[in-house]
């Protein structure tokens, strides 16, 4: 069985690497995007992405817009992983269709556990 593909979208390369390292330890296949436009390109090119981990504040296209676009024609699970921990932001995320909302700073082990739970 092929490892599930997870697209990690964050404009900070250190954050992408941290998340990628923890996910790869659990045998997930991780793709990375540094902004929303790149994320959309990868999402439409790779037809079998199992889950997205998405930052909100990014250049070119923010996480809210990526979520709106993806939800137009996909129910792929989305985890928002963002420094925007305000209640309004979290509620907006759920309104737009995210499956989980995690505020930074976060526990990488808890993030991986949530990914595994969503994909179970």
Language model segments and positions:
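Active-site residues of response regulator receiver
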Residues: 10, 55, 82
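Short amphipathic alpha-helix used as the core "switch/output" element in two-component signaling
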Residues: 41, 64-75
């Amino acid at each position: 069985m092929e490892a599930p593909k997870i697209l990690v979208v964050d404009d900070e390369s250190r954050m992408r690497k941290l998340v990628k390292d923890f996910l790869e330890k659990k045998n997930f296949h991780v793709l990375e995007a540094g902004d929303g436009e790149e994320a959309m390109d990868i999402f439409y090119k790779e037809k079998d992405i199992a889950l997205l981990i998405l930052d909100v504040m990014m250049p070119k296209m923010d996480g809210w817009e990526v979520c709106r676009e993806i939800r137009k024609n996909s129910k792929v699970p989305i985890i928002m992983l963002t420094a925007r921990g305000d209640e309004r932001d979290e509620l907006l995320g759920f309104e737009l269709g995210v499956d989980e909302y995690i505020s930074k700073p976060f526990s990488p082990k808890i993030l991986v556990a949530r990914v595994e739970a969503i994909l179970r």
